[in-house]
Amino acid sequence: MKVGTDAVILGAAATLPSCENSLSPASQYAEDESFPLSTSDSVRRGIEVLDAGCGSGVIGLMVAQRLEAAGFREYDVTGVEIDSPAAEQAERNFGASPWSGHFKCLNVSMLGFAPETAYDFIVSNPPYYDDSLLPPDSRRSTARHTGGDAFGYPQLLEFAASGHLRAGGILALILPHQELTRLLRLAASYGLHAARLLHVRTTPSKEPSRLVAEFTLDTASGKAAGITPTEEYLTIQDASRFPQNKNSWTDEYLTLTREFYL
């Protein structure tokens, strides 16, 4: 599995879950005797992360790196991947990372995945092409095309809304920008509120080609319903800055990804 730009953008740009209902960064209250250290789930649990369709594990690894940089030490990242070679690669990558004790990879289909855990953060770069564009490589077909055993974003929305995303948790995914209208309509039908939309364009003169969308569950009182999401733009390249360099990354893209690229 190659490391694509979509995965890098999602892993770097997605909003990390709040520490409100989890162990605070580096357990900052651990030595504060005035802080009531309850053993209740709402105070003591760590952050639960799900990378749905994790491929080689790059997004989960980036999330772990960012959590560590933010001071979190209590978290678990579960990668679910239907493709056996990719799952094996993810296992190797997880095991070789400095945070190997926080990872596990399950070689199963998301369609049959029924965890008892609810997640604070669900992240995914899901399949999005329809079957009319199937490539000859069956593994690539499963990773990038809906239909069959593929777990596309409609299924991901349903999964998150079916008790697998905690109240206050975040579902983050990246899709072709053309899916925006359908995505928002489907999400609303499952009671998911669009909290943030990052429109990604390759150059300043082009329309956005990718969308990072983040969702939360609507509250029981309906307070989240109807709130306008935060909208942002990211431009990847600007050839006008350095005409002789075909990879003229913008400052904003370099700032976003500098901690991940070698």
Spans of model-derived segments:
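SAM-dependent Rossmann-like transferase core, predominantly class I methyltransferases
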Residues: 1-21, 25, 47-48, 54-65, ...
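Mobile active-site "lid"/loop adjacent to the S-adenosyl-L-methionine
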Residues: 126-159
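Conserved Class I SAM-dependent methyltransferase catalytic core
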Residues: 3, 9, 149-208, 213
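SAM/dcSAM-binding transferase cores
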Residues: 207-262
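Conserved SAM/SAH cofactor-binding pocket of Class I
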Residues: 12-21, 32, 36-117, 121-124, ...
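Low-complexity, intrinsically disordered or signal/transmembrane-proximal segments
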Residues: 28-29
